[in-house]
Amino acid sequence: MRVIVHLGEPFWRTAGRREVEVVLAEGATVADAFSALKQLHPALAAELDNDEAQPAIFVSDEEARLESPLREGEKIHVVWPVSGG
């Protein structure tokens, strides 16, 4: 199945593009999509695997986790969480 990973700031700058299509097996999860994404763009591994802060993940406009299942054609949004005061 194919899914689109939409990369927010700063991830898209590392990948050089805002959207990346990845091909996954049926029954794949967000973690599987991240693995495929890191194979296509190895420099993203350091940003996505950051122990200090994890990116916020949304699938079809709903908050998701790495173990969340995916369906054909879904869009995964990966954004950096921010806070302010």
Question: What residue ranges belong to the model's regions?
Answer:
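Ubiquitin-like/PB1-type beta-grasp interaction modules and other compact soluble beta-rich domains
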Residues: 1-84
